[in-house]
Design a protein with these regions (language model features):
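Sec-dependent N-terminal signal peptides
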Residues: 4-13
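Sec/Tat signal peptide C-region and signal peptidase I cleavage site
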Residues: 15-20
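Mature extracytoplasmic domains of secretory-pathway proteins
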Residues: 51-118
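C-terminal partner/receptor-binding element of secreted or periplasmic proteins
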Residues: 121-153
Length: 153
């Protein structure tokens, strides 16, 4: 019964986050007998702002723990977001600071999170990527800004 409750809780928590599409990975080291370290790129659309797509690159630790999810990935990432369609969302109705994407980077409590912030005075949406842990996070971070522009028809 506890297991069923945990699965249901995880399903509810993941409803609001965007789902990423993996685009590919590039090896950054060569390990002869185990999986290589690599950098992987994923894409996701902002679930509340249709017309904005983001791409995130993240370092992935190789080694023998990698196939089992036991490695803790480093907190190295980059994010780039762009307007790719007309945006009709009223910025004043968006939450001031809302998580739009999260991805586990360790089997034990480490997560990359992306938050959306709204800069109403500049008509811009800011995306902030950070890494969190249960006890402490990392000062590593990255941002991408998307000025909302008129879209040609």
């Amino acid at each position: 019964m506890k297991w069923l409750f945990m699965v249901a809780a995880l399903a509810v928590m993941s409803v609001h986050s965007a789902h990423a599409t993996d685009l590919g990975c590039v090896s950054t080291t060569f390990n002869a007998l185990s999986p290589n370290d690599k950098v992987c790129v994923s894409a996701f659309d902002d679930p509340q702002v249709p017309g904005i797509a983001c791409h995130i690159s993240q370092a992935r630790k190789g080694g023998w723990g990698q196939p089992f999810g036991l490695n803790e990935d480093p907190s190295n990432f980059s994010i780039s977001c762009r307007q790719n369609a007309p945006i009709d969302v009223d910025l004043s109705k968006l939450a001031e600071n809302e998580e739009v994407f999260s991805e586990k980077t360790s089997i034990f409590f480490k997560t990359t999170r992306i938050y959306r912030m709204v800069d109403k005075s500049r008509n811009t949406i800011v995306y902030l990527a950070i890494s969190t842990k249960i006890i402490n996070g990392s000062p590593e971070n990255a941002i991408s800004t998307v000025p909302i522009m008129p879209w040609p028809h």
